[in-house]
Amino acid sequence: MAGETLRKIQSLLGEMVASFIFGFAVYSAILGSTIAQQPAAKVIIGLTVGFSAIGIIYSFSDVTIAHFNPAITLAAILTGKMGILCGLGYMLAQCVGFILAVCALLVCSPVGYKETLNVIRPAPAPFGADNLNVFFTEFFLTAILVHIAFAVAVNPYRPKVDTDGKFVDPDEKEPVDRRITAPLCIGLTLGFLAFMGLVTSGGAFNPGLTLAPVIMSNTWQHFWLYLGAQYLGGLVGGLLQVFVLYKLSSN
């Protein structure tokens, strides 16, 4: 009993640390490329998002769920892939991790508190995007991410077996083992999605990453737009994979 409790605590702590590392990496890339006025700022941010995610998932998947994204976790809860209390615990750990990442960035930042938060806080890109553009961009980006995360990690295809462990469908073949490639797949997905929202929402598709600088700056403009789109998009992506695009058995 004590061992199980310790494992749960370790898993929650691992999810918090994973979220902290991801948040610190992404926030640092955004701040650094903005201050340095890097012409390749968007490329730097996109690569940071993708590469950091790959390393984090490989490092933490033995200890925790390694979602570091409340939209994925909420979709897992609402599709029955995770218990409610357990999932809410992970979501809280993720949010705490992202808030700590903002705090760490503020200590490291060479510019002021307000300026730092203004740079990393998600906001519509300065190209004339309206609320509808932002909402649907975040909706689709999060839906794509969650669908792929479900397909390769949260709810990968598993053929039905009988009591002897044999496939119920005699024509069934051994499924592809995605445990090795799933972190790479998810990281690359995060990377290409980061480029897709450049001219509208900025490409956040992570409620924890969005909410932390909003809380720290106490500036709530647009936050409902991002969070609503991200959670709704995540739910649609999860439902689509679980109930529509999960491979059907012939039996």
UniProtKB/Swiss-Prot annotation:
Gene name linked to the record: AQP
Record-stated family: Belongs to the MIP/aquaporin (TC 1.A.8) family.
**Pfam families with a match to the protein in the record:** MIP
Name-wise, this protein is Aquaporin
Molecular function as annotated in GO: water channel activity
The residues exposed to the Extracellular compartment are: 33-42, 108-133, 201-224
Q: What does this protein do?
A: Water channel required to facilitate the transport of water across membranes. Involved in osmotolerance.
Q: Which Gene3D superfamilies match?
A: Glycerol uptake facilitator protein (1.20.1080.10)
**Bilayer topology annotation:** Multi-pass membrane protein
Comment text on domains: Aquaporins contain two tandem repeats each containing three membrane-spanning domains and a pore-forming loop with the signature motif Asn-Pro-Ala (NPA). In microsporidia, the second signature motif differs slightly and is Asn-Pro-Gly (NPG).
Which loops or segments lie on the Cytoplasmic side of the membrane, by the record? 1-11, 64-86, 155-179, 246-251
- What keywords appear on the UniProt entry? Cell membrane, Membrane, Repeat, Transmembrane, Transmembrane helix, Transport
Sorted alphabetically, which InterPro entries does this protein's record hold? Aquaporin-like (IPR023271), Aquaporin_transptr (IPR034294), MIP (IPR000425), MIP_CS (IPR022357)
Signal peptide positions (record): none
